[in-house]
Amino acid sequence: MLLSILVALCLCVRLALGVRGAPCEAVRIPMCRHMPWNITRMPNHLHHSTQENAILAIEQYEELVDVNCSSVLRFFLCAMYAPICTLEFLHDPIKPCKSVCQRARDDCEPLMKMYNHSWPESLACDELPVYDRGVCISPEAIVTDLPEDVKWIDITPDMMVQERSFDADCKHLSPDRCKCKKVKPTLATYLSKNYSYVIHAKIKAVQRSGCNEVTTVVDVKEIFKSSSPIPRTQVPLITNSSCQCPHILPHQDVLIMCYERRSRMMLLENCLVEKWRDQLSRRSTQWEERLQEQQRTTQDKKQIASRTSRSNPPKPKGRSPASKPASPKKNIKARSAPKKSNPKKSTS
């Protein structure tokens, strides 16, 4: 099972069942600061309750990592000692895949044996999940576009978002050069765009995360549609462009209709942002009902067309019609007709 992870926030949530969610925290283990994820949770897979304890334990492998005996050793160790923190797996952190452990062990154990050491039992590979039969992470399974210079800042008590220093090339960018096209909130727009999420939210902050990325932090108030679970808390909306379109300002109460991409909620130019009005709640629900009805009708037509094509196969083309055999009646009549005798020659 491919697990595509794009970590751009840390949410400290409380589960609906009344159990307190374990909070995510920034990775402080020096060996793991350049991993594709910047947030972790404790206890880790080796039962260390704090990162301070994990730091003391992972230090024993620093020399092994430095000699670069395996390209996946650092990844494997960090996945064990500083497991990635995600909203879906707060109470059961994701483990590294068995294949990652085996690669690290097979690469490094020969060197360890030269110094009379074996692969430690605490890092045994046998109990780890197999890639295609469980949830696990490997270097190939993580999709990330976060550069190495990303750092994390605490915006609110509930979340963390990335901050990145501007390059010299970004300084010329100005919102005044962007001309956003207004998307009208109509039924026709909704049916044609087929948005994957619709929410009522309040804009908390808008900040540029780089030359071609703008992060809009919103406080989700109502969820009318979603293709994956959306927490009722503050979440980031990502605009992967130098222009923030549609253009919105902090403290606005809005209806947002847009798309999800690689598990991230996007805010794109063809999305709809409308100042909130109470009637928008009922209207968006009605539009979604019409969209579902339209999709069912389209699906029914496809099924009918498929059944029709199977029951009425096309006639073969390119063959000349076969000549019709002679009528049996005509043949019988021809056979039964008396033969005419020739007149006898007269004798003299």
UniProtKB/Swiss-Prot annotation:
Q: Which factors induce or repress this protein, as stated in its UniProt record?
A: Up-regulated 48 hours after estrogen treatment mainly in the uterine endometrial stroma. Induced in ovarian granulosa cells after 12 hours treatment with chorionic gonadotrophin (CG). Further up-regulated in corpora lutea by the luteotrophic hormone PRL.
GO CC annotation: what is one? Answer: cytoplasm
The keyword Disulfide bond belongs to this UniProt entry's keyword annotation: yes
One Pfam short name: Fz
For this chain, the annotated S-S bridges are C24-C85, C32-C78, C69-C108, C97-C136, C101-C125
Domain NTR positions: 178-296
One of its GO biological process terms is: non-canonical Wnt signaling pathway
Q: Provide the residues annotated with a glycan attachment (glycosylation).
A: N38, N68, N116, N194, N240
State where composition is biased (Basic and acidic residues): 289-303
Q: Which Gene Ontology molecular-function terms are recorded?
A: Wnt-protein binding
Question: Coiled coil: which residue ranges?
Answer: none
Per the record, the major location class is secreted
Which ranges carry the FZ domain? 19-139
Q: Which Gene3D superfamilies match?
A: 2.40.50.120, Frizzled cysteine-rich domain
What is the scientific name of the source organism? Rattus norvegicus (Rat)
State its role.
Answer: Soluble frizzled-related proteins (sFRPS) function as modulators of Wnt signaling through direct interaction with Wnts. They have a role in regulating cell growth and differentiation in specific cell types. SFRP4 plays a role in bone morphogenesis. May also act as a regulator of adult uterine morphology and function. May also increase apoptosis during ovulation possibly through modulation of FZ1/FZ4/WNT4 signaling. Has phosphaturic effects by specifically inhibiting sodium-dependent phosphate uptake.
Check the UniProt entry and state the signal peptide residues, or none. Answer: 1-18
> Which tissues carry this protein?
Expressed in the involuting mammary gland, ovarian corpus luteum and prostate. In ovaries, low levels found in granulosa cells. High levels in corpora lutea of pregnant animals.
Q: What keyword terms does UniProt attach to this protein?
A: Developmental protein, Differentiation, Disulfide bond, Glycoprotein, Secreted, Signal, Wnt signaling pathway
**Where on the tree of life does the source sit, at the highest rank?**
Eukaryota
Q: What is this protein called?
A: Secreted frizzled-related protein 4
How are the domains described in the entry?
The FZ domain is involved in binding with Wnt ligands.
Question: What family, per the record?
Answer: Belongs to the secreted frizzled-related protein (sFRP) family.
| Residue numbers spanned by region Disordered | 289-348
Composition bias (Basic residues) maps to 330-348
